Amino acid sequence: MTHEFTENYDVIVIGAGHAGVEASLATSRMGCKTLLATINLEMLAFMPCNPSIGGSAKGIVVREIDALGGEMGKNIDKSYIQMRMLNTGKGPAVRALRAQADKALYARNMKHTVEQQENLTLRQSMIDEILVEDGKVIGVRTATNQKYSAQAVIVTTGTALRGEIILGELKYSSGPNNSLASVTLADNLRDLGLEIGRFKTGTPPRVKANSIHYDETEIQPGDKKANHFSFMSKDEDYLKDQIPCWLTYTNQSSHDIINKNLYRAPMFSGIVKGVGPRYCPSIEDKIVRFADKDRHQLFLEPEGRETEEVYIQGLSTSLPEDVQKDVVHSIKGLENAEMMRTGYAIEYDIVLPHQLRATLETKKISGLFTAGQTNGTSGYEEAAGQGIVAGINAALKIQGKPELILKRSDAYIGVMIDDLVTKGTLEPYRLLTSRAEYRLILRHDNADLRLTEIGHQVGLVNEERYMRFQIRKNQFDNELTRLSSIKLKPVAEINKRIEELGFKPLTDALTAKEFMRRPEINYAIATSFVGPAAESLDEKVIELLETEIKYEGYINKALDQVAKMKRMEEKRIPKNIDWDAIDSIATEARQKFKKINPETIGQASRISGVNPADISILMVYLEGKNRSRTR
């Protein structure tokens, strides 16, 4: 078929949520003429659910996006109302930053960034069809029958893809927050031969701030110590007048109301068909699944400085409106709360992610990428992380440059993408620190050291940012070298000072670095013996030094495991391999290999249902093929 295109682009991004924004900013900043199409301009970077960015594992993802040259970290640093570092009483591997957002300001700032970006066109438009010829993307068609050409299309439609809102017995076609659903495009993706799944998520009621009895709840203030998501943010800009959140709980009365009305709950009446999130269940689901618990935590989270709306985190529900009101009024502090919005569930289509490569390009159609909730994940941060990777790879493909594949040892983003494309997901996927086997080297404090070089190589990290990164890296490297070379000897004067501090004296000579491995010895104490660095060090560099030194043994073990896995990842599997020609592998392994088509031995080894014997047989088969080709 011959198409008459009215406009020509390098990349078209469908959907302007958190994935779409990062994808379009990446492609345009890498020099590709990009169209970002959204059903509603007012929904750009909107937060239809929780008004927050970051949290366990997710906060590290935001730091990774920032290190690659993305926008989420910079934007939340300009629009938060509260900032907290989580898990400070635990080890460095699980510490993560979380910000309470002014959601309107966040969306407004991001829209301004997109509007000012060179090479990027922002347009309110419903995309109904992805145009494909000979297995390759050539463009899109809009609902108004305009056709735009493109070498790559990135689908980031979120929960709008055949979205349906469910509230009690009411069910209607809708995207998030009562925006339009994308139905024709959902049909088109299925017609293109992609396997489609159906997921569900939900959101809680919002109540009016001035109707809450805060004196009956527990205050949750922000941190006084400055922290930021972006490495470009400055401590002097850290917000002093932060807005607190508040903690309350459900009680037996709340549970009784829910239990009496379970027959009216769409979750249990059969109205909800989609699979919901395991780690963010609705309140009615929690009451049933955890019947032994007499209360559940609820956090009252302000949605911004210029709104009275307060989000009740932990009370996600699709119960009928009258039941929601009764539940809200049964909660301490909310007895007279005015409900401004009801909670609801939303069902939506997803592209089953085993059909994707680690670049987030579909295996079936060249130039077609998907990212975000379209791939079955939950969360703004997971979406943004996929968005920037899809955007980078779309641009690299068009430019004829090597693709970017983030490994599990590179980033939490790499862990997430590998999980999705290798294992798939049967429920909305959420990143957890427990999913990362190398979490001690995937920390909040070293994201820039891990990924800024990559961001610079692909063209997303500018020279100012790169210079600041090099200064920080040089400070770290130089001071680590210095601490590794200076020795403390067990002489009387030094041991006297150590004993005066209440610590055990030295019995052998130690380097300053070895001295710092003692749990009680921090950088300040160590340098009081060996002298300060040649230049004043940033506090964050000092914290990084302490972590790297104190956990060096564990970090080195992790790096040894990474080296072993790297050898597995370097053993590539031919695209045209005949899985049926391999004798002796288990039937389940053969079926999984056919479904997923792993690209490396490492990826094949991580597929569920595949055992070490199957991998050994596969490696022997490939080695035999290689020998026969070299004869």
UniProtKB/Swiss-Prot annotation:
NAD-binding protein involved in the addition of a carboxymethylaminomethyl (cmnm) group at the wobble position (U34) of certain tRNAs, forming tRNA-cmnm(5)s(2)U34. Belongs to the MnmG family. GO terms for molecular function: flavin adenine dinucleotide binding. Its cofactor is FAD. The lineage of its organism: Bacteria, Bacillati, Bacillota, Bacilli, Lactobacillales. It comes from the Bacteria. This is tRNA uridine 5-carboxymethylaminomethyl modification enzyme MnmG. It comes from Streptococcus mutans serotype c (strain ATCC 700610 / UA159). It is found in: Cytoplasm. SMART domains: GIDA_assoc_3 (SM01228). Homodimer. Heterotetramer of two MnmE and two MnmG subunits. GO terms for cellular component: cytosol. Keywords: Cytoplasm, FAD, Flavoprotein, NAD, tRNA processing. FAD binds at G15, A16, G17, H18, A19, G20, I127, S182, Q373. The keyword tRNA processing applies.
